[in-house]
Amino acid sequence: MVDNLPPLEPSLQNLVEQESLKWIFVGGKGGVGKTTCSSSLAVQLSKVRESVLIISTDPAHNISDAFDQKFTKVPTKVNGFDNLFAMEIDPNAGLGELPDEYFEGENEALRVSKGVMQEMINALPGIDEAMSYAEVMKLVKGMNFSVVVFDTAPTGHTLRLIAFPQVVEKGLGKLLRLKMKLAPLLSQFVSMLGMADVNADTLSQKLDDMLRVITQVNEQFKNPDQTTFVCVCIAEFFSLYETERLVQELTKCGIDVHNIIVNQLLFLDKSHNSCSMCASRFKIQEKYLDQIADLYEDFHVTKLPLLEKEVRGPESIKSFSENLMIPYKPKE
């Protein structure tokens, strides 16, 4: 009987031990501690993987604050680690705002102007943001990190990030089907811009390469052995509602999700008197924890504490990350 099965391990140990995983997304409603959780997961992964990259796709770029180190649009080693890297990208930025490293070829003849790429995709509504993600993914795949953790923006941006391979595949597919008709026009266009080294074949090759990478990424995103999503929430109505909506959307997109983190929990000693505010909050969270247990009985549900001090800096994150592996128990 299924009902007699023991509950799943209340930790992220299953993810850390799953060597086949390539992409791990961490997301949820704003203000629930996604960055702390994603940074902590990246730290734990760095103990068992050869190289780990954490990417922030949240415009707030909180991982710089979390690790107390400034990160950029290019992977940078995190202080205090040999194999953990971090980078921040703006999900609202288009191709024109990506750094030159993303567009460099082996020589000048293979270098494709950002301006030309921008002009080409402007005719495809909604693809600019997706193409920005696509260039980032192409760069990241080329660096062969063992696993990539995404610290995502609040839910709306997250769902667009998940869907970007399909958007790019559709858009580039249209361009490539038209490339024979476009070739003379593109040649004239780049000639007018004074870029003799860039021709229609070069642009076409660039798009072909991009499409090949994105098709592979799309396949990997749909493969539960390679991609999974970790939902972070707090024990309150709106956060739980958003989490359920996110789980349903991820399921529609074919993205694996079987881990939920419930963050910022009060762990009260019932044998001692607590302040009335703490007792009230504890009662509320107990109510929603019961609902979470009912809704997600086939999920790994990890419970993390609300701390007196903020989690900031490499050492603080290292310490907090242990709670992802061993269920938290308050000190006696």
Swiss-Prot record:
| Pfam families registered for this protein in UniProt | ArsA_ATPase (PF02374)
Enumerate the UniProt keywords alphabetically: ATP-binding, Cytoplasm, Endoplasmic reticulum, Hydrolase, Metal-binding, Nucleotide-binding, Transport, Zinc
Any idea which positions bind Zn(2+)?
A: 275, 278
Native organism: Drosophila mojavensis (Fruit fly)
Catalytic residues as annotated in Swiss-Prot or TrEMBL: 58
Q: What is this protein called?
A: ATPase ASNA1 homolog
Record's GO cellular component, any one? Answer: GET complex
Q: What processes does the entry annotate via GO biological process terms?
A: tail-anchored membrane protein insertion into ER membrane
